[in-house]
């Protein structure tokens, strides 16, 4: 549930920032291409935005790794990362509301805050070895290859099936989890994009709210329940 909420946050932020400033702050693979195209065209404005997004994302990921390392034993401390991300998203929204219309420097500030938040979120998903929540290339690859493995293993198990014999299904998470993550990412990007076109920066309440819901879920389990070092459900 929590990873799916984070996927909603990732898709929403990228859609809103892309519509607003023509740059990606979560999906850095695509943003790297935007940077390359801007450099090839000699587009200083687009290149500056994309480069800042990359750097801020990297800083956010590094900060996330530091915060996660403060946990004890094999239990990463999730709440500091989630709280920091929520504060960045809400701070970005408050800043945007308070100073609009944004000049160029203020736009760069919004881009940096969004990329910092998405870097934190990416570090969290990476540490927990779950589906990615800020970019979908790996998630789609995992879904496709996992589906093939799941089907092949199931067919072999059915051919050898006998009473009392294990089913032979793959031990890893079922591929539908990655598929659903992608669908939620897509749906949230569509929804937040539509909201942004009608309500401008207020659309960012969607990703901020999703992260706040994850925080509430984590508070119910003490930040990270035993055995959750590799999962965030």
Language model: regions and residue ranges:
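Alpha-helical transmembrane segments of multi-pass membrane proteins
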Residues: 1-233
């Amino acid at each position: 549930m929590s990873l799916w909420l984070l996927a909603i946050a990732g898709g929403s932020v990228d859609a809103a920032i892309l519509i607003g400033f023509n740059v990606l702050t979560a999906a850095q693979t695509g943003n790297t291409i935007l940077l390359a195209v801007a450099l090839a065209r000699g587009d200083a404005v687009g290149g500056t935005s994309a480069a800042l997004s990359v750097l801020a994302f990297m800083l956010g990921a590094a900060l996330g790794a530091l915060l996660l390392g403060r946990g004890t034993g094999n239990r990463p401390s999730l709440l500091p990362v989630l709280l920091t991300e929520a504060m960045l998203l809400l701070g970005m929204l408050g800043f945007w509301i308070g100073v609009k219309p944004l000049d160029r420097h203020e736009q760069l500030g919004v881009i940096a805050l969004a990329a910092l938040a998405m870097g934190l979120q990416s570090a969290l998903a990476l540490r927990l070895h779950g589906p990615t929540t800020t970019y979908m290339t790996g998630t789609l690859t995992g879904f496709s290859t996992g589906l093939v493995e799941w089907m092949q293993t199931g067919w072999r198990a059915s051919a050898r099936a006998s009473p009392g014999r294990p089913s032979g299904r793959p031990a890893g998470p079922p591929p539908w989890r990655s598929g659903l993550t992608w669908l939620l990412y897509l749906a949230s990007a569509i929804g937040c994009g539509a909201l942004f076109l009608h309500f401008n920066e207020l659309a960012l309440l969607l990703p901020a709210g999703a992260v706040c819901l994850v925080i509430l879920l984590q508070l119910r389990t003490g930040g990270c329940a035993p055995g959750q070092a590799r999962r965030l459900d």
